[in-house]
Regions:
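Juxtamembrane helix-boundary/capping and inter-helix hinge elements in multi-pass membrane proteins
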Residues: 37-38, 70-80, 108-109, 153-159, ...
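Short amphipathic alpha-helical coupling elements at transmembrane boundaries
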Residues: 45-56, 163-178, 244-251, 267-271, ...
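Helix-loop-helix junctions within the multi-pass membrane cores of secondary transporters/permeases
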Residues: 252-330, 395-402
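Signature of multi-pass transmembrane helix bundles
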Residues: 11-37, 49-58, 83-240, 398-402
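Transmembrane alpha-helical segments and their short flanking loops
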Residues: 112-113, 300-402
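Membrane-water interface of transmembrane alpha-helices in multipass transporters/channels
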Residues: 43, 79, 83, 201-209, ...
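Hydrophobic transmembrane alpha-helical segments of multi-pass transport and channel proteins
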Residues: 54, 90-94, 98, 216, ...
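Small-residue-enriched core segments of transmembrane alpha-helices in multipass membrane transport
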Residues: 85-94, 172, 208-225, 244-252, ...
Length: 402
């Protein structure tokens, strides 16, 4: 009886999980797409576009809330500590994004598919209506205001503003977890049906498995090499350090949420450093911002889609602007399923000429691959305090000597 109940709970969790729902949406579109009336497809596309418009309308507030909270909680107002932490997060994310660019180009022979325009319908699917909401302000404005107010709060040690920042971020997290994420399958459905209508979905679906294999390989190589370098190629230390992070990685894989793994990750990271308080301060500060898995995955997916769409590789100068924008936008991301890609869609659209359909595809791909990305994020965050401790201790010695 207990076994039956346990199996029921397990299967119930699977059925209600986001990846299962998204896979179901894709299967429904593939199998029943041709039987769905075109007017219904157009209506569902209109709903998807309207949800996107609503998201873009409130996105500056979402970005502001997470940036404000992230910077307000940093280092208890210690400016030097904060600047070092910010610099290391930016450099780490930037290096990962650049590596992903070259990895994407090298692996395109495995990933990329040339779209046969003769295999698609000549008639495109147009929405019945669109919800065109004005934007409150540019996303950059929300980001800059959040960073500025957060730093001011941290430096001045304003407890009331810290509490406000946390409540604001908690409210935003509730909106994402309880409103936006549950309607993600509906959000995706309209774009998927449009792809099915034009015949592009079948072509794209063939590409998922090779892309996933390349992505997992990239995560494994990058993070493995990072641990080896930091541990001076001491295999035993690498195994011990990574083994300590495994429990947090399992939680992250199953929940697709870095935030959900935060308590376990903090406990795990403490085992890998000498200064336990340092790790306990760093992990909550970087959990939503320093995401190596995302920094490798999103550019890889974005470049692959760009090549499929435009039959060309984005110029490095264009990609460099995207990389900088990516690093800045990461300060506004949430450690919830789909949190990063939500704030990255405007960056992709403005820097890499992403269309609404491409945005819908990468959102779907990101959610499907999110367990692997989150696992990589957690291993990356487990390594971060080790690197930070080395640099921070060296900096303190230099300061004392001078």
């Amino acid at each position: 009886m207990v076994t039956i109940f346990t199996n029921f709970v397990r299967y119930n969790k699977i059925i209600h999980s986001l990846p299962f729902k998204l896979i179901l949406v894709i299967i429904v579109a593939l199998i029943f797409g041709n039987f769905i009336p075109e007017v219904l497809k157009a209506f569902l596309l209109s709903v998807s576009l309207s949800i996107k418009s609503l998201l873009l309308f409130i996105l500056p507030l979402i970005i502001f809330s997470f940036a404000f909270c992230s910077f307000a909680q940093l280092s208890n107002g210690l400016l030097t500590f904060t600047l070092l932490l910010l610099s290391m997060m930016c450099v780490s994310n930037f290096i990962a994004v650049l590596c992903s660019y070259y990895a994407a180009i090298i692996s395109q022979s495995i990933i990329a598919v040339i779209i046969d325009t003769n295999s698609t319908h000549a008639i495109s699917l147009e929405p019945l209506f669109e919800l065109n909401l004005p934007r409150l302000c540019d996303n950059t404005v929300g980001l800059v205001l959040g960073i500025a107010l957060g730093l001011y709060t941290s430096i001045k040690k304003l407890l009331i503003l810290k509490q406000i920042a946390k409540k604001f971020a908690d409210t935003t997290n509730k909106f994402l977890n309880h409103i936006f994420i549950p309607i993600l399958p509906l959000f995706i459905l309209g774009f998927i049906l449009k792809l099915q209508h034009t015949g592009a979905l079948t072509i794209l679906f063939k590409n998922f498995l090779p892309l996933l294999l390349v992505l997992i390989s990239l995560h494994f190589l990058y993070i493995g090499c990072a641990y080896l370098i930091v541990m001076n190629f001491d295999i035993k230390r690498v195994i011990i350090a990574m083994r300590n992070i495994v429990p947090a990685a399992i939680v992250g894989f199953s929940t697709m949420s870095s935030a959900a793994a935060l308590p376990i990750l903090t406990i795990s990271a403490v085992k890998n450093v000498k200064d336990h308080k340092l790790a306990q301060t760093i992990i909550p500060s970087i959990i939503n911002t320093h995401m190596i898995g995302d920094a490798l995955a999103i550019p890889l997916m974005a470049i692959s889609l760009y090549i499929v769409k435009y039959q060309a590789t984005p110029e490095f100068s264009v990609y460099l602007v995207f990389a900088i924008s990516y690093v800045l936008a990461k300060f506004a991301a949430a450690g919830v399923p789909g949190g990063t890609i939500i704030v990255m869609i405007p960056v992709l659209e403005s820097n890499l000429q992403f269309t609404p359909e491409m945005s819908g595809i990468i959102l779907m791909m990101y959610i499907l691959f999110d367990p692997f990305c989150t696992t990589a994020n957690i291993f990356g965050n487990g390594l971060f305090p080790i690197v930070f401790e080395k640099i921070w201790c060296s900096l303190k010695k230099i300061t004392k000597l001078s």
